Amino acid sequence: MQELKDRIVKEGKILPGNIVKVDGFLNHRVDCAFMGRIADEFQKFFDLNNVDLILTAEASGIALSAICAYRYGKPMVYAKKAKSDNIEGGLYQSEIFSYTYKKKVTLLVSKEWLHPGDRVLVIDDFLARGEALRGLCEIVQAAGAELVGIGCCLLYTSPSPRDRTRSR
């Protein structure tokens, strides 16, 4: 998507460790109209008749996923990184390493909101090392749901997260 490339060049920054900082429009200050155009672009790649819900990880993926879910007329579930007192009925969970926070975290999804047979589209802001996506895929599998697609706004190409994610 050319508009995304242009925004990265114009507004993005490269931080030490080759971290791409695009928090001025993607994952801190969110340009919702632009996110809507990204959702429209994603829609070209997925059969939305074959999607029951959108799944993402807390926190940076929520804005894009919520806009996609709204545009597609689907519910959105996000995997929490901390258990709260209001989660009932059991949990699906997967431990991942967060490169953002430099520590292990556990992704949690209530069994109340993800069911066997659900057809799940995973949407996230970044695919860097593939840890969040690995965890989300493990949760989908544990639920007996079906992963029907993965959409990521930005993909780091080195080291290759795509190869690690495909191998799972």
Predicted region positions:
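Acidic, divalent-metal-coordinating active-site segment for phosphoryl/phosphodiester hydrolysis
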Residues: F126-L133
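Short, glycine/charge-rich flexible loops or terminal/linker lids adjacent to PRPP-binding catalytic cores
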Residues: K74-V120
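Short Gly/Thr/Asp-enriched flexible loops that form oxyanion-binding sites at enzyme active sites
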Residues: A63-Y72
